[in-house]
Amino acid sequence: MSRRNPCKFEIRGHCLNGKRCHFSHNYFEWPPHALLVRQNFMLNRILKSMDKSIDTLSEISGAAELDRTEEYALGVVGVLESYIGSINNITKQSACVAMSKLLTELNSDDIKKLRDNEELNSPKIRVYNTVISYIESNRKNNKQTIHLLKRLPADVLKKTIKNTLDIHKSITINNPKESTVSDTNDHAKNNDTT
């Protein structure tokens, strides 16, 4: 009985050729180095899927790519408003990435000022505290915040986005001269060129 060479697709995961594949899929026939390569590959795959610091969204679906068409066409706020209104076919992951970008633009000190102006028993205080906690979480690890937002049920996520957008609008109305993160970056680039 002749030993065939191990299937290179089977070593790196799974062979999709079925019966058409002329290489060996029987692990008992494989030499030890081929088994070690397969074992190492599978263990790395498991480790990668368990690692929360890796943004699997960007690898699988391109969710963290800069040239996403929805965000380019609608802007961050437009993507979030479209998701709330269930228009323009905005996916949950696109909304979560846009929400993370909006959280980076918000300043928790401004929200704390709004919170301090409310009455003690106002239900808005809880909303402000929730948004502040998301801002702090996003500042520490924005990829983990995207995962947390994605785990929320759709109705809860929409309510959270709506509350955050309302706070964002009230801050921009109260402080119209306040520059956003993107404006600050543009000013820094202009200063470098002069």
Curated annotation (Swiss-Prot):
ZnF C3H1-type span: 1-28
Outcome when changing residue 151 to K: Confers virus resistance to cyclopamine in vitro
Protein name (Swiss-Prot/TrEMBL): Protein M2-1
Biased composition (Basic and acidic residues): 184-194
Region listing for Globular core, in residue ranges: 76-171
Involved in RNA-binding, annotated site positions: 8-9, 23, 92, 151
Subcellular location(s) per record: Virion; Host cytoplasm; Host nucleus
Organism: Human respiratory syncytial virus A (strain A2)
Impact reported for residue 163 to D: Loss of M2-1 association with inclusion bodies. No effect on RNA-binding
Pfam families named in the record: Pneumovirus_M2
PROSITE patterns documented for this protein: ZF_C3H1
Effect of residue 15 to G: About 80% loss of processivity function
InterPro entries per the UniProt record, alphabetical: Pneumovirus_M2-1, Znf_CCCH, Znf_CCCH_sf
Free-text description of this protein's post-translational modifications in UniProt: Phosphorylated by host in infected cells. Only dephosphorylated M2-1 is competent for viral mRNA binding. Cyclic turnover of phosphorylation-dephosphorylation of M2-1 is required for efficient viral transcription.
Family: Belongs to the pneumoviridae M2-1 protein family.
Domain notes: Contains a zinc-finger domain on its N-terminus essential for its anti-termination function. Contains an oligomerization domain. The central globular core is responsible for binding to RNA and phosphoprotein.
Phosphoserine: residues bearing it: 58, 61
Function: Acts as a tetrameric transcription processivity factor that binds in a competitive manner to RNA and the phosphoprotein (P) to prevent premature termination during transcription. Transcription anti-terminator that enhances readthrough of intergenic junctions during viral transcription. Preferentially binds to poly(A)-rich sequences. Plays a role in the association of the matrix protein with the nucleocapsid, which initiates assembly and budding. Also, can activate host NF-kappa-B through association with host RELA.
